[in-house]
Amino acid sequence: KKNIKEAIDLLEKNKKDLDFLLLLIKIYYSIGETEKGAAVLKEAIEKNINHPRFNTSLSLRLLFKGDFENGFKLYENRSSKNKNYFKDIKEWNGENLRNKSIIVYNEQGLGDAIQFSKYLIPLSKIAQNIKFFVQDSIFDLFDNKINNLKISSKKSIDNNVADFKITLGSLIKFFYNKKINTNELSIKVEEKNKNYFKKIVNKNKLNVGLVWSGFIYGSGQPYRSIQLEKFKKILNLDANFFCLQNEVWEDDLPFFKKSKLKNYGHLNLKDITALIENLDLIVTVDTLFLHLASSLNKETWALLCIDPDWRWGELNKF
């Protein structure tokens, strides 16, 4: 607490500097001091700071609270959107797509590609020629049998011609409030894989998939991880528990080795997806598995920090 107070004091004295200002706001929200964070943010807004990084930070706050109209406008300032893909293709801003082609590409993380790919479904109702580019590592997760939609990996991203382009993150603003038929999932599960794990999973007990930590050097750490031993009481329940993550931190290894967790973290994502389909519940911190399990309409309990990502805010009411 002393170190946090010293950091806040230093940042408060130097908040005229954008880096200090953004970090100060982030710290206030991260430690649950939301009123102080909001006050600093309001003060900055009144100064009419017009910088892409500040606008992006503000957009995340607005989106979390549900101010989608203003939030998505400012969200266009995010640095990930400004990668120079398809520079000669016009950006789509809601124009009529009849007899037109459009490229959608994921410019953010794997979880975003999985979670937000559902917005390709309503797009496919108004466009007859959609090409969706995703990271190579998750290409096989997507269903290539959806009408008007072709899934492509990023390794084939060069020399593609279309009438329009849009990032997946920007596509959300057009369809976030549309009801999407959950039977038209963009994520596929191969039946033979699903049946294989059906034979392995003992249905005489509750079957729970558990993810308690992410990549140790990943974004948002350590706020996206929980010490495994804190699940001790839960793991003593009369249920089957499956480890889905492929990395166990060194501090967790002693408890992990003596726990009754069944380790399936070595599986590839296609197999993990099939396993999840056979489980009753997924309990996970904010990692790829939260996006994946919820996108499969599996009952999913999210273990979130005090100041979670905007994706887990008001957007989830739609």
What residues fall within each predicted segment?
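Alpha-helical solenoid repeat scaffolds of the TPR/TPR-like class and their adjacent stem/linker regions
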Residues: 1-281, 286-318
